[in-house]
Amino acid sequence: MPLNIQNIIIIINSSLIIILFSSIFFFQLT
């Protein structure tokens, strides 16, 4: 169970980082 929760947290974290970087890239383009 804890492993599953950690996996979910890691996935959410990675997706958040990707969104952050994409937003920064978008703002730099404009």
From Swiss-Prot:
Domain of life of the source: Eukaryota
Keyword Translocase among record annotations: yes
Keyword Isomerase: no
One GO MF term: NADH dehydrogenase (ubiquinone) activity
EC number: 7.1.1.2
Topology in membrane: Multi-pass membrane protein
Residue intervals passing through the bilayer: 7-27
UniProt record similarity statement: Belongs to the complex I subunit 5 family.
Protein name per the record: NADH-ubiquinone oxidoreductase chain 5
